[in-house]
Amino acid sequence: MNTTKFIDEHLYPGQIGYFLTILSLIASLVATYSFAKAFFSKEISVQAAWEKLAKIAFIIESLAVFSCFIVLFYIISNHLFEYKYAYMHSDKNLPFEYLLSCFWEGQEGSFLLWSFWHCVLGVVLLATKKKWGSSMAGVKIGRAHV
């Protein structure tokens, strides 16, 4: 892909955000599939292997979503208006406390905020494994991302 870089144009945040979005999508699909396989497995060793893969995939997904949140905040707070989302939903005159509300003003930011809170819920479910088994984690996490 041949891209023209203009003076004072910041392309890396957008490329990083795009990569993190794709990574979170793939990791969520792997986590959902792995939790389902763990739930339907009859052997304990196979179930444990699928659960381990599912947890790793979900942690990767959560880190990608949290990082994407940080990248979008970087774009908004530094007023990188070459990105449509920052151009449409923020302003240089906004005080710092209102820049955070720019996240959920647009559809993309609302979806990112929704994914963020689902990742927080999933991390809580994974942290309380003794109370919630892989079946509950798979249902909640799978329902959140599919």
Predicted regions and their residues:
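Polytopic transmembrane helical bundles with strong interfacial aromatic enrichment
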Residues: N2-R143
